């Protein structure tokens, strides 16, 4: 029998041990998870809530993952650059958190098929790209009910960002509630063409209040509209996070988004190799949307609002159940039918009762 020299045997054993250790270390490498944010993490609104979701994810999954984020990323070419750099830096899972990141995310996803991507509020998927949305329109409908009960001028204001389906359907949800609970109440809209610009947001809120609005909604990310409402002595409804502390004498409720559970579920599925592209919608039932109702709201009104929330959670009520007509009187959703997710995701019309026009 041929005998190998002791030194050669020891070298072979050491090499085997080294290879084993290398494989073990590789198998234990944490999953790299990246987040791309439209605004600053301190905006107290949309980006702030996504950052809270990232923190919840990091706390839950601990050493299994590492997380990082880039804030203040403009939609368009800048977003594409940041997303691509994350993919090049070997991030395994990338969340892109603004509607205008949709096409840049899709483009980069096609170039990096081994990276998993999830895009918030969009509607384009691919094998390695999923989408996720909050049914904020459910919260808007409840907010519309509160506005219907609390307004004295029958004029409600909306500080709007961009005329995209998400914003349009949220405005429509408020108008549908106003039509039902205080017919003849109108929504006045001011577009600021920005997600985060406290100066413009405050100016828009003040312009609405100057027109007689006594309940201010917003689809922007800073608390500036809330603060303007507080100063002017009118009511407001916060957005994305609970904004009550910015206007304790103004805020009736806030449409709060809790992204943590989805971030945890999606990341765990990547770790488990069970992730599949999907179009996820989370609402009141799932806890993705929450509505802390202020004590400014009378007890009887609060009780009725809580029943509306319960009905939405149970499926007994869907804000977009027909018959629903557009502002020109054309039927969009027939009696007994409910808008599909695809119809909600592409909504490009105002419902009956709206007097404003959608910018072209």
Spans of model-derived segments:
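A residue-level marker of the well-folded mature domains of exported/periplasmic proteins
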Residues: 28-360
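Repetitive helical segments and hydrophobic/amphipathic motifs
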Residues: 16-17
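Sec/Tat signal peptide C-region and signal peptidase I cleavage site
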Residues: 23-27
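Bacterial N-terminal signal peptides that target proteins for export
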Residues: 2-12, 21
